[in-house]
Design a protein with these regions (language model features):
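C-terminal capping/lid segments that line or modulate ligand- or cofactor-binding pockets
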Residues: 389-411, 464-467, 471-491, 499, ...
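Structured alpha-helical bundle/scaffold domains in large eukaryotic membrane-trafficking regulators
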Residues: 68-76, 109, 164, 181-188, ...
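C-terminal transcriptional activation/regulatory domains of eukaryotic transcription factors
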Residues: 6-11, 20-140, 147-158, 185-191, ...
């Protein structure tokens, strides 16, 4: 052992030579990741890059801590000065930051930047998956993994399916030892120890959010790690690899880490909520639901007051970050109470859950800042563009408002029937009025929320989202509500709304393509290998899911589950054709997430379709069904 450590010995020289030959042989067997000329050509100019970096720092960096901002700015400035050659990892990190910022950029060529952002994300993902992965199992590699997951959701690049790569991110972090507190490793500098705590907190938050979003277990518990929360310090207090003691601020002082610390305080509770509501046996008592929900609401209120005071004092925090921090925690309250939401109509004990679900949904919908008509802030831009869990809480909130408004209309009809005269003096030739003579007390407010959600859904398509279903179904929901109020046939109203919405979406999507590419979209069969009904779920889908498990957003050619908007030219039964790719899915589990999200019993019932995302919302038969929406066996 002594001879091996002595660099002057023959053994040391021989071992070094053997290792060097091994590295050369491995390197010769695979190409090294590099920056392609195509990627270099779409790097934005410095003026635009500066604006994009500022957009990122005022939005997501304050919520999901990934970078040490002073260090990042030094490397960023050195890149533009050209003093040192930029490594691929540095360029990918810089471009991912720019990609996340694109939706918040208001300068010229925003539409073309959307196209570039997709290329930046794809290039970073390819670099991350390239051979010789061991060289990327480090802090920079983990930072890039995190940025890719955020960018995919912000830019709508497969952002609705991040639970799987989020699991890879979690395991990468644990492989690097981030689940153990840096105090266990004396050789780690103070700077790197603090960065490890920050990254671990971000990894846990993304894991929790994506697990809640997909209805899946988080695969981590508080017993699996002992890493402490980040210290309450600003980035400038950390140094850069310098082993100096940290000047930790009191908890009452706002710092760059305050939002992340607030997340970690409620994380154990939120992980338990995910475990319980995704448990196949749902073993939480209603008293525990009330206790946990009240605790989370209290924390949300307390932290929002603290962050607002920091904003008023001119600290480094923005309205976007306050709103995002509140919503990402508050959405857990909504999911916790949803199983009891619809039960409140039959059991007064659960009326509090009905109130909490509505209040939470309205809080999520509340704007971050007061805006003039047509004006946008960062929060509005986020709602108009982002997907993943940044979109899901709006779907959950909007569906809650719809269910509540539907319940209020039904209750108002029942109340009016109680006071109706037993005998009417109206001539027999006069048809009875089927509409409501007086509206529910919150009708205007709740309908305004649904109208706002419709405008948001349209804006999302105008800003690059390619899923037109959201607009169609929100229009159907509004049409059904209006028909119930007016006393007209809701099925006819839903069908008319579906027809007009699909035509509107066709025009908007054509306009979006023209804006991004400067030419009209080519719908000929040969224009793209991914166009048309033949795309379905992709090659080999039947080998994985089975022919009778159309679990995605499309189906194979010739299947009865194929999606075709021409179904709106038929009768009301034709609406099944549009939604059939979302229904009729039974994966053999004992629980139905759709039942949970609709507030139905958590046992398995024949006829339910199983889904792990807000796709349960896209059920046109449900919108037309009224009081039957969500009942077993209806529309499936």
């Amino acid at each position: 052992m002594v001879a091996y450590r002595n660099k002057s010995t023959e053994l040391y020289a021989t071992v070094s030579e053997v290792k060097r030959m091994a590295r050369i042989i491995k390197a010769s067997r695979m190409s090294q990741p590099s920056i392609s000329q195509e990627l270099q050509a779409c790097i934005p100019p410095k003026e635009i890059s500066d604006a994009l970096v500022d957009c990122y720092l005022r939005t997501f960096e304050g919520v999901f801590r990934v970078l040490h901002v002073p260090s990042f700015r030094r490397v960023y400035d050195a890149y533009w000065l050209g003093t040192t050659p930029a490594k691929p990892s540095i360029i990918h990190k810089f471009l991912l930051v720019c990609a996340i910022a694109v939706p918040f950029y208001t300068g010229p060529d925003q539409a073309k930047l959307r196209v570039s952002a997709a290329k930046w994300i794809q290039a970073a993902a390819e670099w991350q998956c390239a051979p010789h992965a061991k060289s990327r199992l480090n802090m920079i590699g983990l930072q890039i993994q995190i940025l890719i997951l955020i960018a995919r959701q912000v830019c709508g690049i497969d952002g609705d399916h991040i639970w799987i790569p989020a699991g890879t991110m979690l395991r990468t972090a644990m492989h690097l030892g981030l689940h153990r507190d840096p105090s266990h490793f004396p050789k780690i500098s103070v700077y790197h120890g603090e960065m490890r705590r920050r990254l671990w907190a971000t990894v846990l938050e993304i894991t929790a959010q994506s697990s809640l979003d997909m209805g899946m277990p988080p695969m981590i518990s508080v017993n699996d790690y002992d890493t402490k929360p980040p210290s309450n310090i600003n980035d400038e207090d950390m140094g850069n690899g310098i082993d100096t003691p940290l000047d930790v601020k009191p908890a009452t002082v706002f710092t760059d880490s305050s939002i992340q610390i607030a997340f970690t305080q409620t994380l154990p509770t939120r992980l338990e909520i995910i475990r319980v509501i995704n448990n196949l046996r749902f073993d939480l008592s209603y008293d525990d639901v009330l206790h946990i929900g009240t605790k989370l609401i209290s924390v949300c209120r307390e932290k929002t007051i603290f962050f607002k005071s920091a904003l008023a004092a001119g600290r480094n925090i923005t309205p976007f970050q306050i709103k995002m921090a509140d919503t990402l925690v508050r959405r857990f309250v909504l999911c916790l109470h949803r199983p009891y939401f619809s039960k409140a109509n039959e059991n007064p004990r659960y009326h509090y859950s009905r109130k909490i679900c509505l209040d939470t949904s309205l809080a999520i919908y509340a704007p971050a800042t007061e805006l003039a008509p047509g004006e946008e802030d960062d929060w509005t831009r986020m709602t108009h563009r982002c997907v993943g869990f940044f979109k899901s809480f709006f779907l959950y909130a909007m569906s809650t408002v719809y269910y509540e408004l539907n319940s209020q209309i039904n209750e108002r009809k029942e109340d009016l029937a109680l006071f109706a005269p037993l005998v009417s003096a109206r001539p027999a030739t006069t048809p009875p009025s089927l509409g409501l003579t007086s509206l529910p007390p919150q009708y205007q407010l709740l309908r305004q929320v649904l109208e706002s959600s419709r405008q948001t859904a349209v804006a999302r398509v105008q800003n690059g989202e390619t899923n037109a279903k959201g607009v169609v179904f929100i229009n159907c929901a509004l049409a059904r509500i209006d028909a119930l109020i007016a006393g007209t046939d809701p099925e006819v109203a839903v069908l008319d709304a579906a027809r007009s919405s699909t035509k509107e979406m066709s025009q908007i999507l054509a306009s979006v393509y023209r804006e991004e590419h400067g030419e009209d979209i080519d719908l000929s069969p040969s224009s793209s290998s991914f166009a048309g009904r033949e795309h379905g779920r992709g090659e080999g889908a039947d080998d994985v899911t089975g022919k009778h498990l159309p679990t995605g957003t499309g189906a194979q050619t010739g299947s009865s589950n194929s999606t075709d908007f021409s179904c709106f030219d038929g009768t009301m039964d034709g609406l099944n054709m549009l939604d059939s790719d979302l229904g009729d899915v039974n994966m053999g589990f004992d629980i139905d997430i759709n039942a949970y999200m609709q507030g139905l019993p958590m046992d398995s019932l024949d006829g339910f379709h199983f889904g792990r995302s807000p796709e349960w919302f896209y059920d046109l038969d449900g919108w037309a069904a009224g009081s039957n929406f969500g009942n077993p066996g209806y529309g499936v």
